């Protein structure tokens, strides 16, 4: 590494309201699936690190649950705490918003970053979904007026448009430092944690509107047998009726959830996976702080 090309490295919080594409952006920058995604808000429930390594530097991305104003249930409060706690010790923040939309929760996310006293890059995601391309510039002017951003980047995380320029600008905000992680490392989370998240992703994708929010996944068994991973996953719900829905007629839905989860695990872990799944009931777990702690929520 020459003196003309210093290496930059630091922590970058990825903040925004639910469902703006924070996890899709994290995965795109890392170049691997470290954070689950779905079309439903609040898919991300845990703080995790995504490690994006480039010749010029390393971004340690702190992917967070979406910040939301309503905190009626314990789960919502826990996720908001995780999002706010992610700002401790970070060097910069990415405020991710959806092109054409700015509301109270976007303002909340901006205020949280501003109060942290770190440089903030505005990332305007989903520009490919704008029906009128001419509406982008007036929207950017509206959002940036009276708000201090270190840089503004319209992007499409899903299509990977605009990411190179974003990375260049974010690296400039980070200190000159050697990498914190090795080149092959992509996250601070264990395979056991990621396995549970991949099962939960399928629950978010395959179940109805409300039911995914009443489910969580606990990995009871994770063992290596040569090139075979043996994984046992418990899907927790809050009522017997929900259990029947997750299992489906003749066990069809649970079988589909398991099959798709297994394929995702094999792709991510680079190994064959033998996956068993069970569905169990723990009443009211999502509004019970003790239960949330037992299931690994921070």
From Swiss-Prot:
This is GTPase Era. Residues 8-176 form the Era-type G domain. Residues 42-46 are annotated as: G2. Belongs to the TRAFAC class TrmE-Era-EngA-EngB-Septin-like GTPase superfamily. Era GTPase family. Keywords: Cell inner membrane, Cell membrane, Cytoplasm, GTP-binding, Membrane, Nucleotide-binding, Ribosome biogenesis, RNA-binding, rRNA-binding. GTP binds at residues 16-23, 63-67, 125-128. PANTHER family: GTPASE ERA (PTHR42698), GTPASE ERA, MITOCHONDRIAL (PTHR42698:SF1). Residues 125-128 are annotated as: G4. GO terms for cellular component: cytosol; plasma membrane. Residues 155-157 are annotated as: G5.
